[in-house]
């Protein structure tokens, strides 16, 4: 979408750019650089330099780089601006930092849950393929321990979201090969013994 907005502004020879803003924008090292999305969000920029009172768009936002606007995991957008209408609220830096840090902790918990589910799927496949009874018993014990870990991780994730007023994002804890049957077996194993 960033490329389309830039192309349309170039075709229309539009100079003033308005960048969107949201609570929880990454703050990088806290400096005035493209990695600090909080610093450059919700402001007007000059695309070409024709508006001397405004900072340059690409240099300020890092548009076109991984760390900048429309880069890695960036949720910001931009479009033509008019210097009069800016619907984006300015957020308190501490409030923004707290929201970003909480979202990063939430992403970490989601990643660990996905990793544990992947391990459980692999263990279930290994158990089903095991021909040696001793190996099968060892794998089943490991499966039970891992299922208990998953149950603990899910409880921790739900409590973390509730304690911090965050929405549980079930799509972020799904993996491709995790079925209802896998969930049922995992819960049964976690509650056994």
What do the PLM-derived regions correspond to, one by one?
Residues 1-69, 82-193:
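Domain-core detector
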Residues 76:
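Catalytic core of tubulin tyrosine ligase-like
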């Amino acid at each position: 979408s960033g490329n389309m907005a830039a192309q349309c502004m170039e075709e229309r020879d539009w100079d003033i750019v308005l960048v969107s803003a949201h609570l929880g924008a990454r703050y990088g090292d806290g400096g005035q650089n493209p990695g600090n999305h909080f610093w450059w969000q919700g402001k007007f920029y000059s695309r070409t330099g024709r508006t001397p009172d405004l900072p340059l768009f690409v240099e300020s936002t890092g548009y076109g780089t991984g760390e900048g606007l429309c880069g890695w995991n960036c949720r910001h957008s931009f479009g033509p601006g008019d210097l009069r209408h800016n619907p984006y609220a300015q957020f308190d830096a501490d409030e923004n930092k707290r929201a970003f840090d909480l979202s990063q902790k939430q992403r970490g918990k989601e990643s660990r849950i996905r990793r544990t589910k992947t391990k459980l799927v692999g263990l279930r496949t290994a158990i089903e393929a095991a021909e040696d009874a001793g190996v099968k018993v060892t794998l089943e014990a490991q499966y039970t321990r891992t299922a208990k870990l998953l149950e603990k991780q899910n409880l921790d994730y739900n409590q973390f979201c509730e304690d911090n007023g965050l929405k549980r994002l079930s799509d972020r804890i799904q993996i491709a090969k995790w079925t209802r049957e896998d969930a049922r077996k995992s819960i049964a194993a976690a509650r056994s013994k």
